[in-house]
Amino acid sequence: MKRRFRMVYIEKKGKAEYAYGWSKVGEDGRIVIPPEAVEEYSIKDHGKVMLMPRHKLSGGFELILVGLLTGLLGMDDRLAGLPTTEGKVREIEGKPFCWVRIRDGGITVPVETLAEYLIHPGDLLLSVRGNYVAPVFLVKGPIVKEAKAHELPVYE
């Protein structure tokens, strides 16, 4: 039996997103992935995911399964030089990229790595439905501002 979740549709200045809720960044860099996103994107524990930076307006990152990057999106050449160390940043075209494993429905990113994405312990990240391959965690921008006017669950 599938669980039912309640996403909120948020619209601001012509931009709209479905929000799962807020993910609070733990002191150790842990970020819980909302259960609905885990189900919708078939995210499994121990899978490798890539943190791909978002644009400057909203900040944050997309959480994409590494297998999708290499197969579906054809990023083999760009990812070839990624560090073998989990959570270590490599810049690609001036933007930070890193990989981590999903554990217990969330990710733990080293605090110094999160700083590369302008994210810090205690921050609330707005978790929204991204494109067809990845949930997105936003830091700022009009959608985040509008989301503050709604009652959304906080995952921590």
List PLM regions with ranges.
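Intrinsic disorder/low-complexity detector
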Residues: 2-24, 52-105, 131-156
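Short linear sequence motif anchored by a di-proline
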Residues: 17, 28, 32, 40-48, ...
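Short beta-strand-centered segments at strand-helix junctions
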Residues: 27-42, 101-118
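Acidic-enriched, low-complexity/disordered segments with a strong bias for Aspartate over Glutamate
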Residues: 28, 45, 76-77, 104, ...
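DNA polymerase processivity clamps
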Residues: 45-53, 121-129
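Short flexible/disordered coil segments
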Residues: 83-89, 116-124
